[in-house]
Amino acid sequence: MEGILCASPGCGKPAKLQCPTCVNLKLETPSHFCSQECFKTFWPLHKMYHQKGQPENLPSQFRNYKFTGPLRPTNITPMRKAPEGIELPDYAIGSIPISERVADRKNMANIIHTPEEIEIMRQLGKMSREVLDIAGNAAKVGMTTEELDIIVHNAVIERGAYPSPLNYYKFPKSCCTSLNEVICHGIPDERPLRDGDILNVDVTLYWKGFHSDLNETYLIGNVDERGKNLVKCAYDCLELAVAMCKPGTLYRELGDAIQKHANKQGFSVVKNFCGHGIGRLFHCNPTVPHYSKNKAVGAMKVGHVFTIEPMINEGTWQDEIWPDSWTAVTADGKRSAQFEHTLVITETGCEVLTKRTNGSYIDRHFK
């Protein structure tokens, strides 16, 4: 408990014990005290935190769910809509991506994109980067992920594009916001960001018939060294994988390099979520696993467009899905970090279509 002070108002002494009920409920509350006396004095107020953490205050589908970590869902506002005049993907109305299902049934091979298609995706990648940077610059202590979703939604619409996650298999928001132990596909809600959080924002745009996908993990306030190391490891894993991309590289080789680096840093690599082909379809071939000894098929060819998005965990690589059918969390409740780019294979290597235009992530967030 080094560095933690007593939660009793006006005390300020170093904490020596923690409320056992808060521990059992995995509550993110002021729960440390310097002595039994302070604990008993503050108890009439402190016990109110326990009421807030009880299942009856959670969305109904969570009331019998055993959470793996301290994060809890809060209220989710109604789904927004795109205004008239915005080109819609095939799932925007009915929620089912029919074109993806047709491609799956036909087991379509990796697509070789034309120079004209790549130019559209190049412009789209730049737009997607602009939107993500707007969200990243806005994220701060006290802001809710719902507010970030509004920012993303408006920024996408202002660019004449559609936020690809919106109503994709009924996903209710315009971006994914994944906090702390959430690996991916977190749903923006009304929980305020807190000092020490790590937050991943995942943005995808649909424009002129194509999708572009990227994400980054941000440090909210003062993050501990272990958390910073986790985030930097995820960033480095993406960078080293991108550096390997060129004609002839086997897709399965990326996972070997990513896992080797993550394990060396004391972290693990998620196996159940992968990078993917992208273009006219939100998700298509190739599948791009991030773990070693995977069975990914094929080699990179000029014109292939796909994402790399390693998810790196502080503890176990295993995950489970919340009852909302979307939010993927670590099985042990420890934190996860992720970074993603969309890139195209060229004659001489690759071009990152979602690259930064204002300095590297590390330069901006770790110095």
From Swiss-Prot:
**Binding site residues for Zn(2+) 2:** C19, C22, H46, H50
- Matching InterPro entries: Creatinase/aminopeptidase-like (IPR036005), Pept_M24 (IPR000994), Pept_M24_MAP (IPR001714), Pept_M24A_MAP1 (IPR002467), Zfn-C6H2 (IPR031615)
Q: What is its EC number?
A: 3.4.11.18
Instruction: Tell me which cofactor or cofactors this protein depends on.
Output: Zn(2+); Co(2+); Mn(2+); Fe(2+)
Kindly indicate whether the keyword Metal-binding belongs to this entry: yes
**Positions that bind Zn(2+) 4:** D213, H276, E309, E340
Q: Which PROSITE patterns match?
A: MAP_1, ZF_C6H2
The cofactor note from the UniProt entry for this protein is: Binds 2 divalent metal cations per subunit. Has a high-affinity and a low affinity metal-binding site. The true nature of the physiological cofactor is under debate. The enzyme is active with zinc, cobalt, manganese or divalent iron ions. Has high activity with zinc; zinc cofactor is transferred into the active site region by the ZNG1 zinc chaperone.
Positions binding a protein in this chain are H185, H283
Q: Its GO biological process terms?
A: proteolysis
Instruction: State the source organism's domain of life.
Output: Eukaryota
> Is Protease set as a keyword in this record?
yes
Using the UniProt record, name the top-level EC class of this enzyme in a single word.
Answer: hydrolase
Q: Where does Zn(2+) 3 bind?
A: D202, D213, E340
Instruction: Say which family it is in.
Output: Belongs to the peptidase M24A family. Methionine aminopeptidase type 1 subfamily.
What's its job?
Answer: Cotranslationally removes the N-terminal methionine from nascent proteins. The N-terminal methionine is often cleaved when the second residue in the primary sequence is small and uncharged (Met-Ala-, Cys, Gly, Pro, Ser, Thr, or Val).
Q: What is this protein called?
A: Methionine aminopeptidase 1
